Amino acid sequence: NDNLAATIKTIFKSWFLDFDAVANAEFVQSEYGQIPQNWRYKLLGDLCKCVTKGTTPTTLGKYFTDSGINFIKGESINDDHSFNKAMFAHIDEETDNLLKRSRILENDIVFTIAGTLGKFALVDSSIVPANTNQAVAIIRTSKISPEMLYSYFIGEWQVEFYKKNTQQAVQANLSLTTIKNLPILLPDKDAQKHYMNLVEPLIKAMRTNFAEVERLSELQNQLLTRLSSSR
């Protein structure tokens, strides 16, 4: 998966930093420099249905449970953009109803905004139903595909902007306003389609690999359990 992510990053840089794919296009001046004509900048928040975060159940007098609805924390998200399900906590349905504002849906992007900043993952059907705490932002797109935005994050488009706008308190954190204010360079529709034809199969392959690694890990755990119980 490192190779797949590296390939996505290379394609992203070629398109959005070097403009190799549109080298012959006419360029116009924007507030962030020269960009191809018909491309435009939009704020991340304007491309999303919602950008929100969660709450720790104990602040509502509720507690974690041994099983139930997945509760994602910052440490549940790996550096390679997969989920570490062993690090999920769990809540019951009553607590999830109290925290319905921060329910996570399939194809949301989760992004750490406190503690270790900037880890992110794209949610698939194996993760939901799920909820999260205040250290994790939920980014739900509407005017850009989740896979396309995910590729921007893999391409590290957000890194410098978020680094400059990190709030230093007891621990470093990013506000939801900062998350929403990230300028996103959007190609015209035809260019978007061409770009996604290149990166979407790679993202799909990454997600397939994540699922396969998880399946093999579960199989290994089952075998180890059987071995230990047969002694």
PLM feature spans:
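Non-catalytic DNA-recognition/assembly elements of restriction-modification systems
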Residues: 1-55, 181, 185, 189-231
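A glycine-rich phosphate-binding loop feature that marks nucleotide/adenosyl-phosphate handling sites
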Residues: 64-65, 218
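A short beta-sheet element
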Residues: 73-74, 93-158, 165-171, 175-179
